[in-house]
């Protein structure tokens, strides 16, 4: 897996599917949950996407605001496997 590819595909998923705005210029360090852009239920969708798109299973106890609030954090978690 290439980090840049993971970032691009995850960003597209978040913007298009969760934010309903494919053109949104999401910053890598922009807080999504604490910033009120997505809710905790969206984390489950991100977990399913990570498994489907990258073959990476993220356990429920890792799908937390502390671990997955920004695009950077999400990419780091996916890259960790």
Region spans (language model):
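Short, conserved alpha-helical segments within structured domains
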Residues: 6, 28-29, 67-70
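Conserved catalytic core of two-component sensor histidine kinases
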Residues: 44
């Amino acid at each position: 897996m290439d980090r840049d590819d993971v970032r691009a595909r995850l960003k597209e998923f978040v913007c298009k599917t969760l934010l309903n705005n494919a053109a949104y210029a999401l910053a890598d360090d922009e807080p999504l949950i604490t910033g009120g852009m997505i809710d905790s239920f969206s984390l489950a969708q991100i977990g399913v996407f990570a498994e489907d798109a990258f073959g990476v299973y993220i356990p429920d106890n890792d799908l937390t605001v502390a671990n997955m609030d920004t695009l950077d954090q999400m990419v780091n978690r996916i890259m960790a496997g």
